[in-house]
């Protein structure tokens, strides 16, 4: 099926067997436990699943923490889109990141090389070493020299959160050598970027964002090879981090409209970035699709478009940023991203508050997640807020 176009895969991925079952959409199975055939085979099934294996035909799924059919459908669909062997879904994006780090620690490779900026929660988790990892923060050009004998992962996010910096995945994978590369692909989604095609071993999504697309379901998912999938499922089973069946249903449903949502929001974001760049209160607009912001030519080679995230830098630092955000009326002041409505936030105060002072976003930087509203209405609201914040200064 993965020979089909992505738009077709988004609609039909993970939908196998529905016609035979006499239904058009997957059922939501909320069972927390499942009957087992007998004592011996039930025990075998439990051990098989608890050690990270996939459910075998005819076996009992035993317990929802070990295996859930709706979650498995969502995983199948995302794996096809990311050109991966398998995918493993979790309760949140941070649960997915935690599982990857725990799997690295369990393999005796607790050292992580990471390129900033990352999502603030990922940065915080790595910086604390809470899971037994150690981290070397490196620039893209420093990855090869930062790798040690016990390095288990190289972690990057592109475009980066919240600066929209672009990372060359071909370069990163070459520098990492035999060390697996984990790419946070939340901002791009598989519509715009497929990191496995560039050699990444693991592709992580906060499925809460664009994959779900409506701000009403939380989840995380990692697309990867079969070896890593087994390791991640074992961590998931032991830690109890399984995605809830209702969340799996909503996220899987979100995939069916992902391409049209992503491209519509991207078109608006590109137009909005150009319009905002002319405002005197803004010192810089960061958006991959703007002229001069992709010097290495990653658009077209790695990404098929600039996405729907924008970062703005305001003259006047924190006070200007605070006033701007608080004067918005249509655009919602909230964390998260990738939903139908446009969201605005001040990363240094919110998502990136725990990040070390030397790596924290500037006080004048604002992150904008562009939604599905008309570009003229968004422009009117943002320009009015910029003008009001200047007048109040």
Curated annotation (Swiss-Prot):
Domain of life: Bacteria
Parts forming coiled coils: none
Positions of L-methionine binding: 367
Cofactor: pyridoxal 5'-phosphate
Keyword Nucleotidyltransferase: no
Residue numbers binding pyridoxal 5'-phosphate: 63-65, 93-94, 206-208
Pfam families in the record: Cys_Met_Meta_PP
Function: Catalyzes the alpha,gamma-elimination of L-methionine to produce methanethiol, 2-oxobutanoate and ammonia. Is also able to catalyze the alpha,gamma-elimination of L-homocysteine.
Name used for this protein in its record: L-methionine gamma-lyase
Biological source species: Brevibacterium sandarakinum
